[in-house]
């Protein structure tokens, strides 16, 4: 009956909808696509349709239902160099899948797959080839006896091609793949599935039936699972009868837009040009989904993948002759193309286009500089780009190594990757040496001996003083038996009430004491689970094995705990107010403030800042209790606890929960309830790198101190300006307006003085080939006045004038100013004010630039002013002497 509902399926949307409808009618629950950013912090991106179900297959999470079906967006970049080159490699793709969790198995999976492709998609059996694992007799029997497929259409392959596993150990099983034959007339005598022109694999059925142990032994799983995947783009190519995936309706509208912008016809262009179009089509889909799912361009992890894709797009746009910014235009087409199936694209439209524009503008300048240097290397005939030169491109010009390799490869030139890595390592060593210090660096004996100590037990969650035994003493990074008065040492204890610096939170300070000795502890760090208590022995002697008492400074612990809880609340508020995809990129929890770094493509607005503050303060007033529990990591993640990507967690994790507000994996110290924070205030918001913003904020006593100081300043300003606090804004506004007007009047007077004082200078101009040259030193004028004087002199001398003025505005500052002003006729004969002034300023250790008819510059070496002006005059004379006025 289902087959009669759809007469002809052609479009990508129809293919997707038909797949989901088909399996829904077979009692599969339709699961929406998961984010490209997985919940699992150990995985960078969603690379397969089954990834969201991996915890279910591994028995770590309850199944959403016995049967499920989905259209999952995925990204893979391992074959990025093949994108656009082959007919079907992509970074972004959609994987249609049907899944069984301990319900049906091979028979139903094979039967339904066959019904779908032959009855719903109406593929002819004459165009289908099936591969199976060579030991999977059960699948072979089903295909031949129940489906009725010709045995000649079955290809048996080995474990490499037709046996799936999740790793060296764990669930695994054989698979059966369906291939489409574009040339069935060639017959079945020689079937080579590696022939990409003839065959395309479009549906993979994985039968998870075994568990592999560490010895490689296979045992049957108690519950057998089905995991299938059909590439939407590949099925579109087949049903739309296209020669490649890029010309299907899923991607081609983006290519058409790029074709229109570049004024190049896609179909009549050569293969190399088509590759650039295809890369734009593919990468556009990837970047819009990455940004919509919360990824911001950066130099790390997912952010670097996004940046790399965007930079490839800019470059291939340039190869198509597109000189202007264009990525937002083609991204808009991609969003429009997919927003019905992925509404988040429409909701995040502004964010996506903004992020793309920022990155495009930034990279265009980099690309221009790097390409120029690469062009010089290529034109020189070299066949190898040295590691030094590749590193120079990377370090000086910001040119990614992958892009250098790509451009070099297009010109049959190799890159010395090992040499590049050596240069990179050398730079890291230089940076390390430059920033080295003696403050608790793990060097000498400490590096070797730290592993000898057992893990330090932290007992300071609720108790700020406790007894402990000294396990070791480090003096100048070497183990010693005792510590004496005046020595700075690092003490290792068996247990401690001091919190050791980790997770962004600073360590506690306080004292370690015995009956007759005391250490002032000013820093505690954690190295390999061993706490190092760093401090100076105030008096007495401490020895290894001695029992002592640890006493934490309670005031500073309270402040740090308040700031840590405030950091959790801040992240939740940012997710609610700014973007649900906000994620932590770094943090600092200190005694006096907190700092939170997060992904964002643009600054947080003042209105958003106010809303974030208001939300956090409302949670503080509501007196939410904090619930801290240890639990299995999988349980914590299932409950929605936030985990920081890249952070290593054990199987057991500590969860800090503010019910209904925030839940994070965290090992830091916190308050008992939110009201202990008192209040919360954001004091700054700024960008610290591409795609990363930083907020600094205060809570508790620090926030109260901040408000008190601000109140004092407001009162002082009120007295100074003779205005009530509520009138300060208007009063300052009026003063600014008055100041602007006064400055305009002053500048006008300066210009008039300069005009009357220097207007007679035009009479000293030298005539060369009918052009008037005036080069002079004028001191005591600021930039605006010097500019005004030059323009007035040019006006007096006419279209054939060349005026260069230089001078010292203020002798105390020892700085120079230069201006060059050229008449229209001087510009017509090829003279350029911007180039002239750059040459002049460089003589005096300066620089500048400007337009062909006017430019200005600054410089530092006032002793060379006379020489620079003489050079300028001689240069102009020679230029004009060689000119013949026709």
UniProtKB/Swiss-Prot annotation:
Protein name according to UniProt: Alanine--tRNA ligase
Main location: cytoplasm
General function of this protein: Catalyzes the attachment of alanine to tRNA(Ala) in a two-step reaction: alanine is first activated by ATP to form Ala-AMP and then transferred to the acceptor end of tRNA(Ala). Also edits incorrectly charged Ser-tRNA(Ala) and Gly-tRNA(Ala) via its editing domain.
Keyword Cytoplasm in record: yes
Annotated localization: Cytoplasm
Residues passing through the membrane, by range: none
Keywords, comma-separated and alphabetical: Aminoacyl-tRNA synthetase, ATP-binding, Cytoplasm, Ligase, Metal-binding, Nucleotide-binding, Protein biosynthesis, RNA-binding, tRNA-binding, Zinc
Domain of life (superkingdom): Bacteria
GO biological process, one term: alanyl-tRNA aminoacylation
Reactions performed catalytically: tRNA(Ala) + L-alanine + ATP = L-alanyl-tRNA(Ala) + AMP + diphosphate
S-S bridge residues: none
GO MF, one example: zinc ion binding
HAMAP family named in the record: Ala_tRNA_synth_B
Cofactor: Zn(2+)
Organism, as annotated: Prochlorococcus marinus (strain MIT 9215)
GO cellular component, one term: cytosol
Classification via InterPro entries: aa-tRNA-synth_II/BPL/LPL (IPR045864), Ala-tRNA-lgiase_IIc (IPR002318), Ala-tRNA-ligase_IIc_anticod-bd (IPR018162), Ala-tRNA-synth_IIc_core (IPR018165), Ala-tRNA-synth_IIc_N (IPR018164), Ala-tRNA_ligase (IPR050058), Ala_tRNA_ligase_euk/bac (IPR023033), DHHA1_dom (IPR003156)
């Amino acid at each position: 009956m289902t087959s009669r509902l759809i007469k002809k399926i052609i479009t990508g949307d129809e293919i997707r909808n038909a797949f989901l409808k088909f399996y829904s009618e077979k009692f599969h629950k339709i699961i929406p696509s998961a984010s490209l950013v997985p919940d699992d912090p150990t995985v960078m991106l969603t690379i397969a349709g089954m990834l969201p179900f991996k915890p279910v297959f591994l028995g770590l999470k309850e199944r959403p239902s016995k049967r499920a079906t989905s259209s999952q967006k995925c990204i893979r970049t391992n074959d990025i160099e093949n994108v656009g080159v082959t007919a079907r490699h992509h970074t972004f793709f959609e994987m249609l899948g049907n899944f069984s969790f301990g319900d049906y198995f091979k028979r139903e999976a094979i039967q339904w797959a066959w019904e779908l492709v032959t009855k719903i998609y109406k593929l002819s059996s004459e165009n289908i080839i099936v591969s199976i694992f060579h030991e999977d007799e059960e699948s072979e029997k089903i295909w031949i006896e129940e489906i009725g497929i010709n045995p000649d259409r079955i290809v048996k392959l080995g474990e490499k091609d037709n046996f799936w596993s999740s790793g060296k150990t764990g669930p695994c099983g054989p698979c059966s793949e369906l291939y489409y034959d574009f040339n069935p007339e060639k017959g079945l005598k020689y079937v080579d599935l590696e022939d990409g022109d003839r065959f395309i694999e479009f549906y993979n059925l994985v039968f998870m039936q075994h568990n592999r142990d560490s010895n490689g032994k296979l045992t049957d799983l108690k519950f057998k699972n089905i995991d299938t995947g059909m590439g939407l783009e590949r099925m579109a190519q087949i049903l739309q009868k296209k020669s490649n995936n890029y010309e299907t309706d899923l991607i081609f509208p983006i290519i058409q837009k790029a074709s229109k912008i570049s004024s190049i016809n896609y179909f009549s262009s050569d293969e190399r040009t088509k590759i650039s179009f295809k890369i734009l089509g593919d990468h556009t889909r990837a970047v819009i989904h990455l940004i919509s799912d919360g990824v911001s361009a950066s130099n790390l992890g997912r952010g670097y993948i996004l940046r790399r894709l965007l930079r490839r797009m800019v470059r291939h746009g340039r190869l198509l002759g597109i000189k202007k910014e264009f990525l937002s235009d083609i991204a808009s087409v991609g969003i429009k193309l997919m927003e019905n199936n992925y509404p988040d694209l429409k909701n995040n439209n502004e964010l996506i286009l903004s992020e793309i524009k920022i990155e495009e503008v930034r990279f265009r300048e980099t690309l221009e500089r790097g390409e120029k240097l690469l062009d010089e290397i290529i034109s020189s005939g070299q066949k190898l780009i040295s590691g030094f030169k590749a590193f120079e491109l990377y370090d000086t010009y910001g040119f990614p190594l992958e892009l250098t390799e790509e451009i070099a490869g297009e010109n049959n030139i190799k890159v010395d990757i090992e040499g590049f890595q050596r240069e990179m390592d050398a730079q890291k060593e230089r940076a390390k040496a430059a920033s080295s210090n003696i403050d608790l660096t793990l060097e000498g004996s400490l590096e070797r001996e730290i592993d000898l100590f057992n893990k330090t037990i932290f007992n300071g969650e609720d108790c700020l003083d406790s007894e402990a035994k000294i396990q070791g003493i480090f003096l100048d990074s070497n183990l010693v038996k005792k510590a004496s008065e005046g020595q700075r040492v690092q003490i290792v204890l068996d247990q401690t009430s001091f919190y050791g610096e980790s997770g962004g939170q600073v360590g506690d300070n306080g004292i370690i004491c015995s009956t007759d000795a005391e250490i002032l502890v000013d820093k505690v760090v954690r190295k390999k689970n061993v706490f190092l208590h760093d401090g100076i022995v105030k008096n007495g002697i401490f020895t290894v094995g001695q029992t002592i008492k640890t006493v934490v400074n309670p005031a500073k612990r309270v402040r740090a705990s308040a700031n840590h809880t405030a950091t959790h609340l801040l992240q939740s508020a940012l997710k609610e107010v700014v973007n649900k995809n906000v994620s932590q990129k770094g943090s600092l929890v200190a005694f006096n403030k907190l700092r939170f770094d997060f992904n964002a493509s643009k600054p947080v607005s003042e209105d958003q800042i106010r809303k974030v503050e208001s939300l956090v303060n409302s949670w503080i007033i509501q007196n939410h209790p904090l619930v801290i529990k240890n639990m299995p990591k999988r349980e914590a993640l299932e409950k929605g606890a936030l985990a920081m990507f890249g952070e290593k967690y054990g199987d057991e994790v500590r969860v800090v929960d503010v019910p209904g507000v925030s839940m994070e994996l965290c090992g830091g110290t916190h308050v008992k309830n939110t009201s202990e924070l008192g209040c919360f205030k954001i004091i700054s918001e700024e960008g610290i790198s591409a795609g990363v913003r930083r907020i600094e904020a205060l809570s508790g006593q620090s926030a109260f101190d901040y408000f008190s100081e601000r109140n004092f300043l407001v009162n002082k300003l009120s007295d100074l300006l003779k205005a009530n606090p509520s009138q300060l804004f208007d009063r300052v506004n009026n003063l600014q307006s008055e100041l602007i007007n006064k400055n305009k009047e002053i500048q006008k007077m300066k210009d008039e003085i300069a005009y009357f004082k220097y207007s007679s200078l035009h009479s000293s101009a030298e005539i060369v080939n009918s052009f008037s040259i005036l080069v002079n030193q004028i001191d005591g004028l600021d930039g605006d006045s010097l500019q005004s004087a030059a323009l007035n002199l040019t006006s007096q001398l006419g279209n054939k004038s060349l005026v260069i003025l230089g001078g010292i505005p203020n002798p105390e500052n020892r700085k120079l100013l230069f201006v060059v002003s050229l008449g229209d006729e001087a510009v017509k004969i090829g003279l350029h004010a911007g180039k002239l002034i750059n040459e002049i300023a460089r003589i005096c250790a300066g620089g500048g630039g400007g337009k062909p008819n006017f430019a200005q510059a600054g410089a530092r070496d006032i002793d060379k002013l006379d020489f620079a002006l003489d050079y300028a005059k001689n240069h102009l004379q020679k230029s004009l002497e060689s000119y013949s006025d026709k």
